């Protein structure tokens, strides 16, 4: 019967809690960590301790911020107040920032609506979003949400909730990935790209 030492079993079990990590991958990572020297392991442990102690969210947009800072770097910077981009998670902000195409302000919902599981948007988070819109008075609100059933449900919900605002509400275009042949594109993506076509 296969039985790992307790410390190894515990590590594998913890690694499996990460999204997309099954037993085989967790096992492989655990054995890789066994080959690390003491300094590397202590650095890793310190990083986890700091993550637990220092993680905090910006009270303005709910993105991640460094510990003694009052707001995140995106709210500190002199950014365009005429555009507000609403995302589901802080990770989405960093993905958009890598594209270097958006210079406006952000707001993190914290979750997407799920018609299947019954998950809702936090009422307090929605209240603060409306306050943020009143303060910034943006001309445009961009919904940068996943192209999924949950993303669609959330976009529809937000459009209704924000109908009182004078800002126009738009959603990221959904269409064909660059460099991909029709052979590899599913019919749903192709249909959305076709219906959302732009003048050329």
Swiss-Prot record:
Zinc finger (C4-type): 58-75
Span of domain Toprim: 82-177
Alphabetized Gene3D superfamilies for the sequence: 3.40.1360.10, RecR Domain 1
GO MF annotations, alphabetized: DNA binding; zinc ion binding
Keywords for this protein: DNA damage, DNA recombination, DNA repair, Metal-binding, Zinc, Zinc-finger
Pfam families according to UniProt: RecR_C, RecR_HhH, Toprim_4
BP GO terms, sorted: DNA recombination; DNA repair
UniProt similarity note: Belongs to the RecR family.
Matches recorded under HAMAP family: RecR (MF_00017)
Role of this protein: May play a role in DNA repair. It seems to be involved in an RecBC-independent recombinational process of DNA repair. It may act with RecF and RecO.
UniProt protein name: Recombination protein RecR
Organism: Chlamydia abortus (strain DSM 27085 / S26/3) (Chlamydophila abortus)
Gene: recR
